[in-house]
Amino acid sequence: EILSQADNPRAFDALIKAIEATNSGLLRYQYARYLLGKQQLAEAKEQFDALVADPAATVDHLIGAAVLDIELSDSASALLHLDRALSLGQRVSDAQFFKALALIQLGDPSGAIDILGEVGPSTNYARALQEAAAILISEGDIGAATAFFEKHRKTHPNGAELNFAVHAETLQTLGSIAAESVLSSGISAFPTSTRLLFSRANFRERAGFFELAEADYREVLNLNPGDANALNALGYALTNNTNRFAEAAGLLEEAISKDPRNPAIIDSLGWVYFKLGKDRQAEVLLKEAYKQYPDPEVAAHLIELLWTQGREVEARDLIANQWRASPNNEHLRETASRLAIPLPE
């Protein structure tokens, strides 16, 4: 009730008095988290310091205090709290992850890698894998990063599906074609993983192997018939890679019937309607998508519609606004180049 009145400066008077009167760890912890959310870090630290001063501090209190210390670059203090948390045997993977972050902050990447190797499936599992890969890649050792992922899959088999996904994402950021092999291995191990199938479909589509990508998109639909996101992915891919626009429109119309407020689906349907020559319907949809989600890719679709209708001033204004917000964006650059639209200086 008090938190619901947070905009009232006097709303917390009763809470603070209750904390002072009872020294309730639960109330103090809730107040500390509220202060964190408001970015009142110094005030939040006062509350966390009081919490961890109690010998009976809970794991949540200790990890919360450590996370704040890391935010404040007080890594040594964070490590003390995290070691206490680890001794309690609860939320072990979370404590290990944040301990690794503290070690990174202290300039001990080797120690961080050792700890990250112990983090099991948990809230921060994907971030742990990403941090480890970033350390190893920054040292110029892609092979060591791959070995880390492979070892982790063996020691933490319950996290293997997510491991394959993060491993492939890491390789893709490096422009490595080995990402497809990792995804294929993952799909062999987890043939019903829509996450891995989506990732491989996206990779194959970008690499120019659309027939293979389409097969993956369709397998996702086989696993999740009628799923709006899967329908959108396949419909949008067909629009961009084939002239099967009527088929794509059918998929996207089904998608929007299931999720009518999704701006990605609205954009996709507007885009395929444009390809079908339904300019009036396309414009309504593309403008609505852009209103909800002013993304450069959505903007590029609307820019192309406007430009091909001879509405060059509107198109130039839109591309200028987007170019300022997202300079050198690939979608804007490709559209401008293909249509010979001058880009802003």
Where are these regions (language model features)?
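Alpha-solenoid helical repeat scaffolds
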Residues: E1-E345
